[in-house]
Amino acid sequence: MKFGGTSVGSPERIKSVARLVTRNGRPTFVVLSAMSGTTNELVEVADYLYKKNTNSANEVINALEQKYMGHVNALFDTEEYRTRMRQFLCEEFAFLRTFTKDFFTSFEEKQIVAQGEIISTTMMVNHLQETGVKAILLPALDFMRTDKNGEPAPGAIRERLTRLMEKNPGYEVYLTQGFICRNAYGEVDNLLRGGSDYTASLIGVALQAEEIQIWTDIDGMHNNDPRFVAHTEAVRQLHFEEASELAYFGAKILHPTCVQPAKYAGIPVRLKNTMDPDAEGTLINNELVRGKLKAVAAKDHIVAIKVKSSRKLGSPDFLRKVFETFEGYQTAIDMIATSEVGVSMTIDNVSHLAEIVEELKKYGTVTVDENMCIVCVVGDLDSANTGFENLATEALRHIPVRMISYGGSNFNISFLIREEDKQAALESLSATIFGKKKNEQA
């Protein structure tokens, strides 16, 4: 069971999660994020320290310490546990203050950011123990490992975690942190933000769990973005590939990396709502409902790049040179469309956009369109199921479409549009595919 920051965002929420993790009466492994807002505040501390602004860094640390001291009084009933937690927090925040006196690098930043999850898991395990639950904290730094490329190392994780579990049998609840780890050199490191979903999936696979549960503040994956479209509905079941597409193209409830380990191990993933724990949520497994469109998602901040080949370089290796340019800057391509004279691509990582464009100019005329958005329709879109692509394109007939990607996946058809047209596109797709008209959404 994995719980995100909003799920443990207050002492009351921590108590609710504690009840959830013990209600099935079976041994449970729990992955926790930092309490909501904490990681952002720790990143703020690191930013100040990079700028050598120790006074501002200390102000944030002091405010954070006061907030957590208040949480202790609300979360714990006995003086024994309150004293224990106050002592722990004093040591934690004293540790954070040591970074205001030393040379500061990305290594120190990772240690600072890691403390949010260390605090939340320590508070949770002590709360469980105070209420009589046999619980233990297994620090992620003892078993979560990444390789030299910064990717999780499943074999090393499984070996270390199995050894830890064998040394600590018989507990009702095992807890760990979500995105902190050690790299290939044994140094404290962090997975990308949102990586706690990935951690939960890797742990579930390592332990051969019956099910991996991701708990958030929404009732499963919805068939459209509820921030833009009213009266969306939770999708009760998704195939692993459908869930991957939705997560990659903008469904914030699930991190894209979470799905693949579970898919290969054949372990179902269930998305649940901590605010409404009895709601059905979304089940992700290997079952595919034939001939059905499941959901719509959108990905913002997309840049489209078009390269029109010059006659001189209009050779068979034109595409190879274009793709090698993106590979050289470790920039992934989301969508691609080719013609006899050129190629169009989209990216969302613009950290090397200027360099990429400059290099692409060697191979042809380059056009860049920013402030674009990818809208995707997900479901059983196998080529044998005719008509669904027409349904999607008909819904967007009044919206300028820059690119269409179809056929690279049996589960997704994607449209590149302007960001300003996003809401209209999502509403129209809901009306056409799911029968939710705009006047019903008001």
List where the protein language model places each region.
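Nucleotide/pyrophosphate-binding catalytic subdomain
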Residues: 1-254, 259, 418, 441-442
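Flexible loop/turn segments at secondary-structure boundaries
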Residues: 8, 38-39, 145, 182-184, ...
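Structural motif
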Residues: 27-30, 111, 134-136, 172-175, ...
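Glycine-rich beta-alpha junction loops
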Residues: 35-36, 218-220, 269, 273-278, ...
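A conserved active-site cap/scaffold subdomain adjacent to cofactor or substrate pockets
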Residues: 239-285, 289-308
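A conserved regulatory-domain signal marking ACT and ACT-like small-molecule sensing domains
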Residues: 280-442
